[in-house]
Amino acid sequence: RWSAEHPNLYTLVLELKNAGGQVTEVTGCEVGFRTSEIKDGRFCINGVPVLVKGTNRHEHSQLGRTVSKELMEQDIRLMKLYNINTVRNSHYPTDPYWYRLCDRYGLYMIDEANIESHGMGYGPASLAKDSTWLTAHMDRTHRMYERSKNHPAIVIWSQGNEAGNGINFERTYDWLKSVEKGRPVQYERAELNYNTDIYCRMYRSVDEIKAYVGKKDIYRPFILCEYLHAMGNSCGGMKEYWEVFENEPMAQGGCIWDWVDQNFREIDKDGKWYWTYGGDYGPEGIPSFGNFCGNGLVNAVREPHPHLLEVKKIYQNIKATLSDRKNLKVCIKNWYDFSNLNEYILRWNVKGEDGTVLAEGTKEVDCEPHATVDVTLGAVKLPNTVREAYLNLSWSRKEATPLVDTDWEVAYDQFVLAGNKNTTAYRPQKAGETAFVVDKNTGALSSLTLDGKELLAAPITLSLFRPATDNDNRDRNGARLWRKAGLNNLTQKVVSLKEEKTSATVRAEILNGKGQKVGMADFVYALDKNGALKVRTTFQPDTAIVKSMARLG
């Protein structure tokens, strides 16, 4: 059978003969055999529930919308290397060669009809509700289906994107289900209406996903058609999403927005190249969305952004936990759907904090898909000079595939091992005479001295603001709300102060520039026996003023 992990293909040969039995035409194509369905409320391939580890992909190159075969090959190679198993063709059917690549090398595909009327909104003016546009909706749906229906990579049909919902999408859904009942059909704007087999809302929070899967009698899986929004410094919340996907059967992943930055390289008058964005072309003042076109996991020439490494790590299909530190016993979970871990080799080592290899080895592991297995690597005696060590696990393929070589690390884990407490190499030194002063009006740490020398250039106060990322500036719940609440201009006012010989406890109001209280903060300052000052801060926002905050701590 065909799957993204084992894309088994066969060659179908068709011969056309005339009435006399003579062959007049011969043609052929690659075909694969697999099932795609919603079974017991879960999205399944070949009867097996799978997690969608996906991304959205626009067609983009330095030639514009014309994408070469070589660039498509580069795209699929990178996706396979970075543990992506699904691609959504956003927001239109793409070059036929892309389908052949996904069939051949193994990517699940969500093929999307070229229907988007975003500018008309989702209300009564939506074209989805106007039956005079039914023929246009049906025509684009028919063309998508009939052109590509035999590709095994297409496991889900998408009716379109951000075009409202109404009679026209109900009819396109009905038609798709009439010609092919099994393969799932999704449409984000249908939400929980009947004309979608998957609840595929975009950019829902972790709490919203938990609320959905916690309901009784749900019969559709939650698979986000878009999530994370990989613009600039991003993807920091991915771990929390996947803690839900890996523990809630009805939450089955999603497709990151998106794969590639849609901008161009230009050369300036000094011969240096730079990226262009919206506003760099056309007359001055022409409307644009600025750098909003740059929200990919890779840049426009397919160089990975740093957050693609986060995606690779979280999407990896082999994950381990350390259950016995003394004997280096690890519990390994196989998240592959159709692959035994005996297709991979485990290389492990223990390194000291200076990178010295203290022990190493290789291991073959037999573990069926979705199963777990305990593996004991054996106790390692650490030298007396080692204060801290690290157990590193690295997985690679035993045999190369066309896109993934045997030297490519497909998964890794690292665990901290406690070294010797009484190491001869490191002995605590006395910190000298340390003293601190807390301002009695603000509660701020106003002075910290060591042997009489001041260490602070200015008092240390609570900060609830930081430079905004691209997503912070775009997000309606981001930096604009932080500024509206005045979190970028704060003062402190002591409510209570308790001082002891080596500690101080402060409770303070936190005020914005308008004098409004945005919350209460508790500070605990404490010197330890070595002279180190430890500060613990707790902040409780006033939700009447503070509607959103940057992550703290």
Question: Language-model segments: which ranges?
Answer:
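Substrate-binding/catalytic cleft of secreted carbohydrate-active enzymes
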Residues: E73-L81, T86-N299
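Secreted/periplasmic carbohydrate-active enzymes, especially glycoside hydrolases
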Residues: R1-D95, L101, Y105-M109, R140, ...
